[in-house]
Amino acid sequence: MKKTLMAVGLAAVISIPFAANAADYVIDTKGAHASINFKVNHLGYSYIKGRFNKFDGEFSYDPANIAASSVVVNVDTRSLDSNHAERDKHIRSADFIDASKYSTATFKSTEVVDKGNGQLEVKGDLTLHGQTKPIVINAEFIGAGQDPWGGQRAGFAGTTRLELKDFGIQVMGASSYVDMELHVEGVQK
């Protein structure tokens, strides 16, 4: 009788699908599967686009409990690249982001809100130009699964608008803000 109860109990436990747990990921910058891009208005006539070439970070994601998710990203502001060396030098200067003095920008999430259908609201603190301010990133879960090398990956995209004055950065020409576009693919630890 004991053996029968144990067998039934074991069978019941094995047949229950395991709930997804939070998984920790490293942002895949080595494989160039992530990017931090920006767009700023140029003189009211067009947009300048660029990116930050050096950054790192990690995130925790639990599809069964989105609120338990978190993200931390560190950006080397000296790696700003708008595909124009003289302009990059000027943007990195004390006139704007002062990358020699403030070489790292950091984002740390404080809350992740599930908006439904893969849409997320990632709230957190951004430290840029020596100022820490709360921001919201509107994000989208792209997908997750096994990669061809036997690892697990998860990917997200997001956007946010940063008001330059909030971070003590002077207005760049016609634009008082910069739009950020983020693409993140993580490799599970």
Curated annotation (Swiss-Prot):
Homology family: Belongs to the UPF0312 family. Type 1 subfamily.
SMART domains tied to this protein: YceI
Record flagged with keyword Transmembrane: no
TM stretches of this protein: none
Main location as per UniProt: periplasm
Cited Pfam families: YceI
Keywords: Periplasm, Signal
Protein name (record): UPF0312 protein VC0395_0473/VC395_A0785
Annotated GO CC locations: periplasmic space
Record's subcellular location: Periplasm
Signal peptide: 1-22
Source species, domain of life: Bacteria
Coiled coil: none
Keyword Signal: yes
